């Protein structure tokens, strides 16, 4: 079968559908979403991974950084010291396998290879493994637990399987991970950080206006750094529903989410509007008033001060580096949470809402 060109929207849809019974309603699943591209854009990773515990992202990795790092509330999980080193080692092996697959496919690309690997604990505490793969947005291969190898109907599946079989004990490592390592990790996470599954972070909100076409302005209601991802935004005019605008939604590198909704109104009428936000982290719906120009000026001053503080921090970092090179101990340890990889969506469904006057931000990007 021929291989179609990559369709980014299809890739996201595929990984939304693949989990099956491992939906967001279950908090007892551990899933790794792996993606590799044969022709990455300059400055972007060729391979990246997001790890999910139930509906929450707990891990990120990409080939530029080369280290597995915790996300969201899992940054504070009381894990054993070697845990993240083990995650890093395993994902570097996966990175090598995925990039080797492109050699087996030849140079006809571009190709996008994705994998969904993990396990779910059933009611009787037994583990149900998942190991499926997609090429350019179409599922084409899985890992057969009985045969202990990869297989599929496409010739590309045979080519990749043969290539991976040549790697040192790759099939045995895959089998061991699915049947033993994955359920063990899942049980450890549930034991050490079950409270993190109830993590709720309320959004920081802002409502701003900017000029649009002659005689009109655009109101933008923005929500920052919230979790869980389900969120409702709606506009009111003098207390009455004002319809919905154009929405935007996406994940942050720390496991939280951001969203916004924009509405076009008549110039001079902006002060009649407000934004209402509903979220699990809020005790009640929050009313967000239009930000005044004076407040915006204060924000600009704050940004300038922030830049100055970052500059000072950079100078301090240079001094710290020199201190460490000279053999002196470091006075602190800093956690880094950047991620240049594109995060894949979590399985789940959006919260129901009245679409006539509510802008619903879905649980999947």
UniProtKB/Swiss-Prot annotation:
Record topological domains on the Extracellular side: 24-297
Modified residues (Phosphoserine): 334
Protein name: IgG receptor FcRn large subunit p51
Tissues where this protein is expressed: Expressed in full-term placenta, heart, lung, liver, muscle, kidney, pancreas, and both fetal and adult small intestine.
Disulfide bond annotation, renumbered to this chain: 119-182, 221-275
Residue ranges of the region described as Alpha-3: 201-290
Glycosylation sites: 125
Record's function text: Cell surface receptor that transfers passive humoral immunity from the mother to the newborn. Binds to the Fc region of monomeric immunoglobulin gamma and mediates its selective uptake from milk. IgG in the milk is bound at the apical surface of the intestinal epithelium. The resultant FcRn-IgG complexes are transcytosed across the intestinal epithelium and IgG is released from FcRn into blood or tissue fluids. Throughout life, contributes to effective humoral immunity by recycling IgG and extending its half-life in the circulation.
Chief place where the protein resides: membrane
SUPFAM superfamilies assigned: Immunoglobulin, MHC antigen-recognition domain
Transmembrane segments: 298-321
Residue span of region Alpha-2: 111-200
GO biological process: IgG immunoglobulin transcytosis in epithelial cells mediated by FcRn immunoglobulin receptor; immune response
Residue ranges constituting the Ig-like C1-type domain according to the UniProt record: 202-289
CDD domains per record: IgC1_MHC-like_FcRn
Keyword vocabulary terms for this entry: Cell membrane, Disulfide bond, Endosome, Glycoprotein, IgG-binding protein, Immunoglobulin domain, Membrane, Phosphoprotein, Receptor, Signal, Transmembrane, Transmembrane helix
Residue numbers spanned by region Connecting peptide: 291-297
UniProt superkingdom: Eukaryota
Chain residue ranges for the region called Alpha-1: 24-110
Spans within the Cytoplasmic topological domain: 322-365
Quaternary structure and partners: FcRn complex consists of two subunits: p51, and p14 which is equivalent to beta-2-microglobulin. It forms an MHC class I-like heterodimer. Interacts with albumin/ALB; this interaction regulates ALB homeostasis. (Microbial infection) Interacts with Echovirus 6, Echovirus 11 and Echovirus 30 capsid protein VP1.
Originating organism: Homo sapiens
Family according to the record: Belongs to the immunoglobulin superfamily.
């Amino acid at each position: 079968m021929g291989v179609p060109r990559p369709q980014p929207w299809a890739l996201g849809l595929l990984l939304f559908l693949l989990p099956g019974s491992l939906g967001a309603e279950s908090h007892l699943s551990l899933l790794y979403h792996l993606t590799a591209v044969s022709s990455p854009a300059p400055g972007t990773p060729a391979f990246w991974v997001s790890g999910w515990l139930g509906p929450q992202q707990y891990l990120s990795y990409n080939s530029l950084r080369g280290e597995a790092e915790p996300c969201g509330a899992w940054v504070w999980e009381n894990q054993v010291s070697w845990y993240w080193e083990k995650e890093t080692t395993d994902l570097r092996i996966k990175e090598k396998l995925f990039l080797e697959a492109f050699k087996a496919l030849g140079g006809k690309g571009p190709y996008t290879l994705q994998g969904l690997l993990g396990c779910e604990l059933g009611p009787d505490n037994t583990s149900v493994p998942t190991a499926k793969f997609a090429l350019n947005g179409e599922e084409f291969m899985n890992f057969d637990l009985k045969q202990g190898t990869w297989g599929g109907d496409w010739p590309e599946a045979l080519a990749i399987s043969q290539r991976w079989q040549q790697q040192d004990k790759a099939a045995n490592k895959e089998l061991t991970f699915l049947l033993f390592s994955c359920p063990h990790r899942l049980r450890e996470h549930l034991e050490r950080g079950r409270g993190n599954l109830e993590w709720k972070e309320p959004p920081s909100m802002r409502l701003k206006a900017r000029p649009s076409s002659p005689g009109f302005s655009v109101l933008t209601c923005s929500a920052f750094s919230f979790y869980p991802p389900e969120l409702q935004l709606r506009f009111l005019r003098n207390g009455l529903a004002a319809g919905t605008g154009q929405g935007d939604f996406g994940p942050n590198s720390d496991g939280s989410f951001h969203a916004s909704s924009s509405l076009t109104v008549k110039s001079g009428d902006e002060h009649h509007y407000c934004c209402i936000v509903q979220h699990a982290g809020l005790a009640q719906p929050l009313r967000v008033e239009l930000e005044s120009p004076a407040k915006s000026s204060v924000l600009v001053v704050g940004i300038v001060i922030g830049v100055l503080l970052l500059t000072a921090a950079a100078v301090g970092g240079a001094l710290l580096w020199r201190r460490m090179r000279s053999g002196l101990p470091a006075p602190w340890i800093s956690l880094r949470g950047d991620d240049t990889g594109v995060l894949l969506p979590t399985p789940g469904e959006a919260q129901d809402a009245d679409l006539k006057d509510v802008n619903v931000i879905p649980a999947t990007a």
